[in-house]
């Protein structure tokens, strides 16, 4: 069975991506990163999801990006914008986050002898991050094969982004087909310690709209529904 490293945040998209990789016959090795994000409940969700989907191994890395990057996701003094107030790249953008995450996944893939990395980015229903686009994924894959021993020896690495062209409602439908319980996932940028979502940020809006478009009841725990 081929090995794959799957970046798992604990959110809806990364959980669906893990289920897709598993469904495609990969032995999945999950990688979650604590980069100082304020929505730490997402990492607790990642733990539960990794166990439920029976990953072969689950690594948690601590990498404090708060000293390098000012973002609403890492700096409590920066307000998480309410949906609809963003212009251009939002305050929730964490500089180079996906590049850092993919680089860590790449390093572990080399150690494992894996040629496959999965990431749950989408360029359809997203907040405008530059590192969620198809040309970015293609560029990283090219770099990975130029910069690694595996690539130089002809064992080419593939960065899989199976959700890249899917709207949120199709992602949700695909995940449900694979048996995902989305109530276990946390997407909110400012979820509380129990994982209850604010219902106002971009992530909450996109998630809520996705379930509505899929005509499926939203199982998310919202703070205003307590």
Swiss-Prot record:
Q: Disulfide bonds, which pairs?
A: none
Q: Which domain of life is it from?
A: Bacteria
According to the UniProt entry, its GO molecular function terms are: ATP binding; ligase activity, forming carbon-nitrogen bonds; zinc ion binding
In this chain, ATP is annotated as bound at 8-18
Query: Top EC class per UniProt?
Result: ligase
What keywords appear on the UniProt entry? Answer: ATP-binding, Ligase, Metal-binding, Nucleotide-binding, Queuosine biosynthesis, Zinc
Where, by residue number, does the polypeptide cross the bilayer?
Answer: none
Which GO terms fall under biological process for this protein? queuosine biosynthetic process
SUPFAM superfamilies from the entry?
Adenine nucleotide alpha hydrolases-like
Q: In which pathway does it act?
A: Purine metabolism; 7-cyano-7-deazaguanine biosynthesis
Q: How is the cofactor bound?
A: Binds 1 zinc ion per subunit.
Task: Quote the EC number.
Answer: 6.3.4.20
Binding residue positions for Zn(2+): 188, 198, 201, 204
Show the catalytic activity.
Answer: 7-carboxy-7-deazaguanine + NH4(+) + ATP = 7-cyano-7-deazaguanine + ADP + phosphate + H2O + H(+)
Family, as annotated: Belongs to the QueC family.
The role this protein plays is: Catalyzes the ATP-dependent conversion of 7-carboxy-7-deazaguanine (CDG) to 7-cyano-7-deazaguanine (preQ(0)).
Protein name according to UniProt:
7-cyano-7-deazaguanine synthase
